[in-house]
Curated annotation (Swiss-Prot):
This is UDP-N-acetylglucosamine 1-carboxyvinyltransferase. The lineage of its organism: Bacteria, Bacillati, Actinomycetota, Actinomycetes, Mycobacteriales. InterPro entries: Enolpyruvate_Tfrase_dom, Enolpyruvate_Tfrase_sf, MurA_subfamily, RNA3'P_cycl/enolpyr_Trfase_a/b, UDP_GlcNAc_COvinyl_MurA. Cell wall formation. Adds enolpyruvyl to UDP-N-acetylglucosamine. GO terms for cellular component: cytoplasm.
Length: 418
């Protein structure tokens, strides 16, 4: 039976919530543990569905993995399987991040083409071309990407687009390559910086992370490490928008506000009061938000993962706004569900024009991906009556204790079997 949420609108969310490790970091860090024989420990891990899925992938490759609350322990053997071509791999997008480590450790990798959120085309072209620049041959065969290399050699690589996934796979493939790799137009996301911090603690020689150019000097061997996962800026941003949309007052801990600089600035423009601290922030809103234009871009631009929240707040704002999606072409399918809730919006290519209204109307809606699901719950909190949110398994993949946290903040929400 698939679960659904019953969400009653009208509550002004108030209180404090702490975010744990980033989904977009922990899965890549787990994969990076493949690079070193021995036991690597990750702390501050989020208790979300994708972590046990990645455990299953690593176990299938020969690792021993234990999950104890927010701590994940990975013991990597001397001899790994290079074949990640089994069902667990197809269930979520991040599984492709084993491609780089397996190619580096085994000289060969077979990785099933991954699944995950239905938010547009996310081809592996840049992953493959990056590995090929390092000396590997790659091909797509029978639903899997295959990489083979007698040895990897450092190279100058320029990405067509600052892809997070391609940056990660090139990093993990090049840390033990012979010589120097210079990666230009690299992704600058905080999760990339977190991966580089972990790799450096394992003995990698990396400079420039957080900038468009990352330089890697290959080393012969990496060693296991202990590492604390960076806080989840997307979950933190979701709580920030929850405060503003419900005209509430929420304090968020466990996240450096600099990672959410632009979203918090956008909330200020919409009329929210924002206070920032060393490891958290507070968002207060006591009136209808003002319409605010957005465009999604790679970090440090506005994150595409918060685009549903930008649509949500503008749906209940004063005025007309334009949201431009520059990263994933299919992310506007979320708008169809917002229309069910009574939003006044229309899609034109990679833009959506929203005319704000005072209140949305309760109905039944369906999640299509992790962030759309969370965005629909926030929108339901701004509707009259009770809204049914279906396919909430998507939300479980990215938001730990979502219902419990909302209830603690004053929302009326329950999980039931549909």
């Amino acid at each position: 039976m698939k679960d659904k949420f019953l969400v009653t609108g009208g509550a002004q969310l108030q209180g404090a919530v702490k975010v744990y490790g980033a989904k977009n970091s922990v899965l890549k860090l787990m994969a990076a543990a493949l690079l070193a024989e021995g036991t690597t420990t990750l702390t501050n891990c989020p208790e979300i569905l994708d972590v046990p899925l990645m455990r299953d992938v690593l176990v299938g490759l020969g690792c021993d993995v234990t999950i104890d609350g927010s701590t994940v322990t990975i013991t990597t053997p001397a001899e790994l399987s290079s074949n990640a071509d089994f069902p667990a791999v197809t269930q979520f997008r991040a599984s492709v991040c084993v491609l780089g480590p397996l190619t580096a450790r085994c000289g060969r990798a077979v990785v099933s083409l991954p699944g995950g959120d239905a938010i547009g085309s996310r081809p592996l072209d840049m992953h493959q071309s990056g590995l090929e620049k390092l000396g590997a041959t790659t091909r797509i065969s029978h639903g899997a990407v295959v990489a083979e290399a007698e040895k990897l050699v450092g190279a100058n690589i320029t990405l067509d687009f600052p892809s997070v996934g391609a940056t990660e796979n090139i990093l993990t493939a090049s840390v033990m390559a012979e010589g120097r790799t210079v990666l230009d137009n690299a992704a600058r996301e905080p999760e990339i910086v977190d991966l580089c911090r972990m790799l450096r603690s394992m003995g990698a020689n990396i400079e420039g992370e957080g900038s468009p150019t990352i330089t890697i000097e290959g080393v012969e061997k990496l060693t296991p490490t202990q590492h604390e996962v960076i806080g989840d800026r997307i979950v933190a941003g979701t709580w920030a928008y929850a405060a503003a949309m419900t005209r509430g007052d929420i304090t968020v801990g466990g996240i450096a506000p600099r990672y959410l600089h632009l979203p918090l600035e956008k909330l200020k423009i919409a009329g929210a009061k924002v206070e920032t601290y060393e490891n958290g922030f507070r968002v207060q809103m006591d009136k209808q938000p003002e319409a605010t234009d957005y465009q999604t871009l790679p970090f440090p631009g506005f994150p595409t993962d918060l685009q549903p929240m930008a649509i949500g707040i503008n749906a209940v704002s004063n005025g007309t706004s334009v949201i431009t999606e520059n990263v994933f072409e299919s992310r506007f399918r979320f708008v169809d569900e917002m229309l069910r809730l009574g939003a006044d919006a229309n899609v034109d290519g990679h833009h959506v024009v929203i005319r704000g209204i005072e209140q949305l109307s309760s109905t039944s809606v369906w999640s299509s991906d992790i962030r759309a699901g969370a965005g629909l719950v926030l929108a339901a909190l701004c509707a009259d009556g009770v809204t049914e949110v279906h396919d909430v398994f998507h939300i479980d993949r990215g938001y730990p204790n979502f219902v419990e946290n909302l209830q603690k903040l004053g929302a009326t929400i329950e999980r039931v079997s549909s």
